C-alpha cells in the first residue's frame, strides 16, 4: 500500500514500488497475513514534468521520435521529470543530461533502430590538453568494446559525464535485434565488423554510461540488445534495481549488466535471462592506459534471479585493473552453464588481481558447473596461442595476472551436470586461497557431459567432483558432494588442503 492505496503484490525481497507523491513524506506498507511493515519515504520535490508527447513524440511505432524525446530531455530543468507515457517509440540514440529523472511509464516501449546508417557513433578516446581529461590525464574516454578503447555506435541511452540521473518505470527498452541478414545477431552481418577484418565501429548497447556518477536504473525491462545490455565504465555510485534483462539463449554477446572500472555499484532484485553472462564484472584490458582501467571495487549483487546464460555472476576476463571488494549474496541461479565464474589468462597484467571476493547464501538448480575458476580463458584472437594456453610455468612478468583469496559460503547446488567445481590457476601464479564453507552439491539423474571451462584441452565431463590445479590453499569446510563418479577431489599442484 502507498499512502493507504493498494499498490500491488510481490513475492520478492527487493520490490519496485511506484505511485509515491513527489516532495512529501509517503507511507509505504507491506502486509503479509498478520504481519505488517511500514516505511516512511520522503521523496524529493519535482518542479516540472515534461511529457514527450508535448514535444511532438507520437509513440505510434512508425514515426521516428528521437529528436522529440531528446528535446524533452534537453528542456527538462534540474530535478524535473521527463515522462514517456504508454506507446511504442521508434528511436535511434538518446543522450542523457545531469539532474533529471526519466520515467518509462507502464506500456511505454522504446524501439531501437538497428540500421547502421541511421546511428551516430563516438570515438574510443579523444586526446586534449594536458590534465584536462579523466583522472588528470589528457584523455577523454568515450567508446569501449570488450575492454579496449574503440569507436562505438551510440546506445539507446548514452550518458557521458552526467550525474544525478534516474531512469525508472514499468516500461521497456527493446533493441529489436534478431538474426535477420541485416541485423546485429546475424553471424555474417556481425563478422563484417570483426576487428581482424577491419571493423571500425562496434555494436551499440542498450544503456552505455561513461564517467557518470549517481545513476539509478529501476523497474523497467531491457530486451534484445545488439550486444551487452547495460555497460557502465569509469562510473561511481550506480544502482540497478528491480530490472528485468532479457535475450534469447542463442543471442551473441548479450551480457546483462557489465560494470567496468566502476566503484560503488549495487545490483539488487534484478532478473536475467540472456545469451551470454548475466553479470560480468570487468576492468579493461592491458592495452588501455592504466589511468583508464582502474579496479572495479565495492560491488554488491543481492537478491537477483539468473535463469539461462553462460555464467550467472562472472569476474573477467577483461579485468586488467583488478576487482576488489565484491559480494554476491542471496541470489538464485537456474539453468546457467556456470554459476560463479572467474575468467582470466596470461596477458591481463600484474594488476589483474581479484581481492576481497565473497559469494554467499546462494541457491542453484540445473547449473551445469556451479564453480569455475579458469586461468586459461581462450577468447580473443590470441586466446589459443601457446603463450596463453601453455600448462608449463612461464616467467612471471608485467603480463602475468594474479588471484587473491575468494570465499564461497552457504551455497547449495542441485541437479548439476559436469563438475562440482573446476579450478585452474596458473602454475607460475597460483590461486592464493579458495575457501568453500557449507557447500552442498548434488548431480542430476540425467546429467549429460559438458565442457566446464572455455580453455584448450578441456574435454566434456559428467558428474565429476572438485577438480583443482595450481592452488596454494584449498580450504573445504563442511563441503558435501553427492552423486559424483569417481573421486570427490582431483588435485594437481595444490600446496595445502584443509578439510573440516
Predicted region positions:
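Extracellular/periplasmic carbohydrate-active domains that bind, remodel
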Residues: 1-500
